[in-house]
Amino acid sequence: SVYYGSIEAGGTKFVLAIADEHFNI
C-alpha cells in the first residue's frame, strides 16, 4: 500500500511518499 501525505512545519511544506518498504521524504 502507498500513502501520500503532507506535513507543514516551520512554514515549510514536506511531502511524504511512504510504501511498504520504501521511505521517501
From Swiss-Prot:
Q: Supply the EC number(s).
A: 2.7.1.4
What is the pH-activity profile? Optimum pH is 7.0-8.0.
Q: Which reaction does it catalyse?
A: D-fructose + ATP = D-fructose 6-phosphate + ADP + H(+)
The signal peptide annotation in the UniProt record is none
Activity control note: Inhibition by zinc ions (Potential). Inactivated by EDTA.
Annotated Gene Ontology MF terms?
ATP binding; fructokinase activity; metal ion binding
Q: Which cofactors, if any, are listed as required?
A: Mg(2+)
- Where does this protein have coiled-coil stretches? none
**Which keywords label this protein?**
ATP-binding, Carbohydrate metabolism, Kinase, Magnesium, Metal-binding, Nucleotide-binding, Transferase, Zinc
Intrachain S-S bonds: none
| EC class of the enzyme, as a word | transferase
Q: Give additional notes from the record.
A: Two isoforms, fructokinase I and II, have been found in this organism.
User: What family name appears in the similarity comment?
Assistant: Belongs to the ROK (NagC/XylR) family.
Q: How does it assemble?
A: Homodimer.
Q: What is this protein called?
A: Fructokinase-1
